């Protein structure tokens, strides 16, 4: 197969219809179309408004704690004996992950649009916590849809959301995971169009969500690019991030897309292996179709039915991925690779013991890829891994899997 011709820039998408090549778009019910167009108009206006930018910057700095640090993981780097590994410390943000970046931007949009009720979906609970947090900060009611399976395995985050005043609605349809929670949130939105803002947590969904979530998360890569130039005097050789829906990854990747010297690697949930259906590696083992308002790579059976998938990480068990990632895969700019549950668990423990940092299981997938790659690289090479969140929420899951009684 001929290698696709590289575009002049990888940063120009999406087009007016929300397409990244053949991916993206807005495949939604007619009742939602006016809302989607209203959101797009509000976003186009907001992103060119200095006041909006100033308010978002102030909240990011004084409320969320940005910029997050770029930290040289010396213990892990020396243990592996190859490339220098840097962590982009999104785990240090308020609420403990990258999710707050997007939530701050979207709550300001909701305010501009005059919406008085916030709904959100969540998998690992991090986006639910971030949504509940900013809803509390702005005095708005918040309903969070969460798969019943995830409610069970993420109890600390469920309690946090309730503490913050949010109503958590468990969804038992399907496998009771992120896909099902998103379905319910979309149903709610259709029936409450006047007053409700749907605060999507990942870079998927109908246009303009993939674009606006990417833009709000790109602060990660913008900072990391500047920080590595200050600390190493050059760009990294490799950047790595975990990909579920793909918001933390696109946030890191986007500012580096046109830097040809930087290799970019997205890490999918390989679960128990790609041979069966117990994984969530939609780009390694899926094919394009439509889900949640956009065309993208999805896990499907022979009849085109969406599969449920599996991952040890609640934040990665989504059977699809943001459309921009699908386009970046097909264009050849980004490599997407699967990491198995046991590899992520090993990396979780290794990071904890060599760095004194307990990473989220999502981030542990990215670290596992670093564990594979770094030893094959020279000691003069530099790698950035996005530490997308902290692992407090996962200690019970990991403890159970390791046979510990917590």
From Swiss-Prot:
It comes from the Bacteria. Its cofactor is pyridoxal 5'-phosphate. One of its GO terms (molecular function) is tryptophan synthase activity. The modification N6-(pyridoxal phosphate)lysine is found at residue 99. InterPro entries: Trp_synth_b_CS, Trp_synth_beta, Trp_synth_beta/beta-like, TrpB-like_PALP, TrpB-like_PALP_sf. The beta subunit is responsible for the synthesis of L-tryptophan from indole and L-serine. PANTHER family: TRYPTOPHAN SYNTHASE (PTHR48077:SF3), TRYPTOPHAN SYNTHASE-RELATED (PTHR48077). HAMAP family: Trp_synth_beta. Belongs to the TrpB family. This is Tryptophan synthase beta chain. The gene is trpB.
């Amino acid at each position: 197969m001929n290698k696709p011709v590289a575009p002049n820039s990888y940063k120009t998408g999406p087009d007016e219809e929300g397409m990244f090549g053949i991916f993206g778009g807005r495949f939604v019910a007619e009742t939602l179309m006016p809302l989607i167009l209203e959101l797009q108009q509000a976003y186009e206006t907001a992103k060119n408004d200095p006041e909006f930018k100033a308010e978002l910057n102030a909240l990011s700095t004084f409320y969320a704690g940005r910029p997050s640090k770029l930290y040289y993981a010396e213990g892990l780097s020396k243990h592996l004996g190859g490339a220098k590994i840097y962590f982009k410390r999104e785990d240090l943000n308020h609420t403990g992950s990258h999710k707050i970046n997007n939530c701050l931007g979207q709550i300001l949009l909701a305010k501009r649009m005059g919406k008085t009720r916030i709904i959100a979906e969540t998998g690992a609970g991090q986006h639910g916590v971030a949504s509940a947090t900013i809803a509390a900060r702005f005095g708005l009611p918040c309903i969070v849809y969460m798969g019943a399976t995830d409610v069970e395995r993420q109890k600390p985050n469920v309690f946090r959301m309730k503490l913050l005043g949010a109503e958590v609605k468990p969804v038992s349809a399907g496998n009771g995971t992120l896909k099902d929670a998103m379905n319910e949130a979309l149903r709610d939105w259709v029936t409450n169009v006047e007053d409700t803002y749907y605060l999507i947590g990942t870079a998927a969904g109908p246009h303009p969500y993939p674009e606006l979530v990417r833009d709000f998360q790109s602060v990660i890569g913008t900072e990391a690019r500047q920080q590595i130039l200050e600390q190493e005097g050059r760009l990294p050789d490799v950047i790595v991030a975990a990909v579920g829906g793909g918001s933390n990854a696109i946030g890191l990747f986007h500012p580096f897309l046109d830097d040809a010297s930087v290799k970019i690697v997205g890490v999918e949930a390989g679960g128990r292996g790609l041979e069966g259906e117990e994984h969530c590696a939609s780009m390694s083992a899926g094919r394009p179709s439509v889900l949640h308002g956009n065309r993208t790579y999805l896990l499907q059976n022979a009849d085109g039915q969406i599969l449920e998938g599996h991952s040890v990480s609640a934040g990665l068990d989504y059977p699809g991925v943001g459309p921009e990632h699908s386009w970046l895969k097909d264009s050849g700019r980004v490599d997407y690779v699967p990491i198995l549950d046991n590899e992520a668990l090993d990396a979780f423990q290794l990071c904890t013991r060599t760095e004194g940092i307990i990473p989220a299981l999502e981030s542990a997938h990215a670290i596992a890829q670093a564990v594979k790659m770094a030893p094959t690289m020279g000691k003069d090479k530099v790698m950035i891994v996005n530490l997308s969140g902290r692992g407090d929420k996962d200690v019970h899951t990991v403890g159970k899997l390791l046979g510990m009684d917590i």
